[in-house]
Amino acid sequence: MKNKKVLIVSARYYEELSNSLELYATSSLSKIKYKIIKVPGVFEIPVVISKNIKKYDGFIALGVVIKGETPHFDFISSASTQAIMSLSVDSKKPIGNGIITCLNMKQAKARGKKGKEAAKAVISVLSQ
């Protein structure tokens, strides 16, 4: 695991929540080299992973999508999840999905530890 490199791509749209996701994700990566790239929103995460797919052994996608009054929530969460899954399967590299989708801010704040779960998933696959 020493020589493995992981890229964390973190959406800044809800910055306070993203910071929490990052903190929990990085707390699990003490034995792995990692870099964090910050992007404006969840929709930009897949393209940044795609651009870096050959440089890293694994990836962690972090961000928050909160349901509003329009169907935008459904489009963004579905499209980003689909793109991340396709990238992972096509590249045969693990991508921990730490993008949380919530109905309100209270739910989002309660799920800040999901970054750690995404990191642990990547570590688990990399160690196989």
What are these regions (language model features)?
Residues V47-A83:
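Glycine-rich phosphate-binding loop
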Residues T26-K54:
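Active-site rim loops that border cofactor/substrate pockets in soluble metabolic enzymes
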Residues L23, F43-S50, K113-K116, K120-I123:
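Amphipathic, non-transmembrane alpha-helical secondary structure
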Residues I37-G41, F75-S77, K113:
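Active-site nucleophile and cofactor-binding loops and adjacent substrate-binding regions
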Residues R12-Y13, V64-V65, I100-L103:
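Short, ordered loop/turn segments at secondary-structure junctions
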Residues N3-I36:
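Glycine-rich phosphate/diphosphate-binding loop of Rossmann-like nucleotide-binding domains
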Residues S80-Q128:
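C-terminal binding/interaction regions
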